[in-house]
Amino acid sequence: MALMPRLSPLAIALAGVLAFPALASADIIEVGKLDPPATPSCPAKPCLAVSRTTGYQAKVGATRSLMTIPKNGRIVAWTIALGKPGAKQTQFFNDKLGGESQAQLTILNPRRKLRSRAVAQGEPQKLTPYFGTTVQFALDKSIPVKKGWVVALTVPTWAPALAVGLGADTSWRASRGKGTCEDTSTQTTQTQPNQLAQYYCLYRTARLTYTATLVTDPVPATTTPKKTSG
């Protein structure tokens, strides 16, 4: 079941973009969307969660740069598929990883040597009420983005938004430096403006279960000059 809280801001944003098709043209792109969608691991065993980091999907099969912005525009919403951990699993994660499940978007500007700089953040959202569903959050304020930037998922505590047991050609990166990939409880989220972090750690056979809604910048309609007689 898909839930869509606070639809009004998203509906208004999309309506504003599409209201004048004769004057300008914009696309709506779901960044990161692939079919079939991945299923988060919880409550199955092992019930694994994304924890205390910022991450993005690097590859799914032959598809690379899955979370890279394809065109200039604005991010207006994001969607996350959540597993449904049991009561004991939820309590375990809450106790070990800093509290209630929550997440937000982070926009990254990739730099050299697997480093990325934080450009913007979405509002943090509590996820527990939506366990077992796919939920869409409209942003209170849309985020302007540029082609080549990356949409990442920031999880300050934990989120049951990880599909596991996939092929070795599927992988995601986290904002953890060399030598720290096994440490998934230390806080490494990238939440400060202009913060630079290294995305050294690559986790194979797993997929982050989120996407982001991009409304591209409108392109003025081209008109054919009228021919003059004579």
Each PLM stretch: what is its role?
Residues 11-21:
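Bacterial N-terminal signal peptides
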Residues 221-228:
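Extracellular mucin-like PTS domains
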Residues 68-88:
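Extended extracellular/luminal ectodomain segments enriched in beta-structured repeat modules
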Residues 27-47, 96-192:
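Aromatic- and Gly/Pro-enriched, solvent-exposed loop/edge beta-strand patches characteristic
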Residues 1-11:
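Bacterial N-terminal signal peptides that target proteins for export
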Residues 50-70, 134-137:
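Short beta-strands within extracellular/lumenal beta-sheet-rich domains
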Residues 22-26:
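Sec/Tat signal peptide C-region and signal peptidase I cleavage site
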Residues 185-221:
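Compositionally biased low-complexity segments at domain edges in trafficked proteins
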